[in-house]
Amino acid sequence: MGRGRSSSSSSIESSSKSNPFGASSSTRNLSTDLRLGLSFGTSSGTQYFNGGYGYSVAAPAVEDAEYVAAVEEEEENECNSVGSFYVKVNMEGVPIGRKIDLMSLNGYRDLIRTLDFMFNASILWAEEEDMCNEKSHVLTYADKEGDWMMVGDVPWEMFLSTVRRLKISRANYHY
């Protein structure tokens, strides 16, 4: 029991000596280290973050351009598999966009109906341009060149071959 004796006590040993139901139990150290002995390094841009509750979480570095490109390619391949064609849809005033599978739709009317339901909005397109009111929105799309065009101005099949993104904007009508 002298001071010359060196002992390595863990937090579990020290906590078992105290009263687990007493007031001193709130001051004991409950941290636990989990070491699996896995050998993987941080040379590939992997960083470790505290995931809470004492766990470390491996996450790729934000600067790792190869990783970002691989994830984007994987997402694109996942979304555009055989029989599907997903495009992003953003609505003015809504901070989060959505994706919609155009191959599952049967034309412009089905697209408009789906977007009306998805965003709870009255959406106009080229065929219904004359029917406007104050709460209407206009559906446009970005083609391969990045030009924004009115949805419905070309046949559906041609639209599917050129569309890259959809945007729902407020219709600004000045009388």
From Swiss-Prot:
Residues 1-29 are annotated as: Disordered. Pfam families: AUX_IAA (PF02309). The keyword Transcription applies. Residues 19-29 have a biased composition (Polar residues). One of its GO terms (molecular function) is DNA-binding transcription factor activity. Gene3D superfamilies: Phosphatidylinositol 3-kinase Catalytic Subunit, Chain A, domain 1 (3.10.20.90). Its main location: nucleus. A motif (EAR-like (transcriptional repression)) lies at residues 34-38. One of its GO terms (biological process) is response to auxin. It is found in: Nucleus. The keyword Repressor applies. One of its GO terms (cellular component) is nucleus. It comes from the Eukaryota. Keywords: Auxin signaling pathway, Nucleus, Repressor, Transcription, Transcription regulation. Residues 1-18 have a biased composition (Low complexity). Coiled coil: none annotated. Residues 84-173 form the PB1 domain. Induction: By auxin. The N-terminal half of the protein contains two conserved domains I and II. Domain I includes a slightly degenerated ERF-associated amphiphilic repression (EAR) motif which seems to be involved in the activity of transcriptional repression. Domain II is required for the correct degradation of the protein through the SCF-mediated ubiquitin-proteasome pathway. Interactions between Aux/IAA proteins and auxin response factors (ARFs) occur through their C-terminal dimerization domains III and IV. Aux/IAA proteins are short-lived transcriptional factors that function as repressors of early auxin response genes at low auxin concentrations. Repression is thought to result from the interaction with auxin response factors (ARFs), proteins that bind to the auxin-responsive promoter element (AuxRE). Formation of heterodimers with ARF proteins may alter their ability to modulate early auxin response genes expression. Belongs to the Aux/IAA family. Homodimers and heterodimers. This is Auxin-responsive protein IAA20. It comes from Arabidopsis thaliana (Mouse-ear cress).
